[in-house]
Amino acid sequence: MSEGRAPEAVVWDLLRGAIMTRVLGLVVDLGIPAALAAGPKPVDTLAVETGADAETLHRLLRALASEGVFTELEPGVFGHTEASELLVGGTGWAEFAHLFGGVWHRAAGGIQADGREPAFERIHGTDYWSWLAAHPEEREIFDRAMAEGRERRTDRLEAFAWRGDETVVDVGGGNGSLLVELLERRPGLRGIVLDLPETVRDEEALGERIEFVEGSFFERVPRGDVYVLGTVLHDWDDESAARILRTIRRSASGDSHLLVLDAVMRPGNEPDGSKWLDVLMLAVLNGKERTEAQWRELLAAGGFEPVRFHEALIEAVPAADG
């Protein structure tokens, strides 16, 4: 948001954004947030515990502290702020810092305007999903990051008029965390998670009411009453996203519902974080964020008709002629 700010400040914030992201990711990967979990420590102690150079670490933490991430309580002694506590672990924010400051950061640095393959593929020689399959430790980090905010996403699902006894198919549901949260709130529901075999999941957390089905959403989707796509379609270009929707449409009955948990990008110059996420999708996956008009067009191509647009939730039903 630039209204009321000096033009130079607007440009400067954009210029320094890349290095801020990299520094945050580096500090998280060093384990600094966890090292400070028990209380403030001198930077010399942190350097010994994490294998970093003390002077370099001091400069990195000082820069982050100026943005409210960590605080320098006295010269050379750092502690947590509410913002840095999010990075200790277990919430997904540490994983996002690792991704944004690492492999996604390198992909963003390779963005070109030629409309060809994503920068990630140009750099690594393979697509992101194949790369994750070959790097299981990164796949696990990615899945934990995607689980961040599951309570918020589940809150959005409450806008749907649940009957209470539906079978819910979470298409591309990763480790199943979204369905776990939903079924805890609605004990009458039954869940099915569809995702690739290499997806890391917690069988104990899934429980008896959730079945994990291995497979590709480009090929086959289990039958259900409600299909959920939680931040899946933005990973794909229009043609691929329409293929996913058509696969679901083949399994859906006439009274099934589709719930899409994805951003509805604001048009024009309105400030909207999803516009920057859209550029990240371009760099890493050749995916995209979409406006309401673009969502309507995509749903129609996939055999669905939108019923209503909630905040970050699109409700649709099979089109009569789908």
Which positions does each model-derived feature cover?
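C-terminal lobe and adjacent flexible extensions of AdoMet/dcAdoMet transferase-like proteins
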Residues: 314-322
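C-terminal alpha-helical "lid/dimerization" subdomain adjacent to the S-adenosyl-L-methionine
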Residues: 261-302, 307
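Conserved Class I S-adenosyl-L-methionine-dependent methyltransferase catalytic core
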Residues: 2, 7-42, 48-49, 54-166
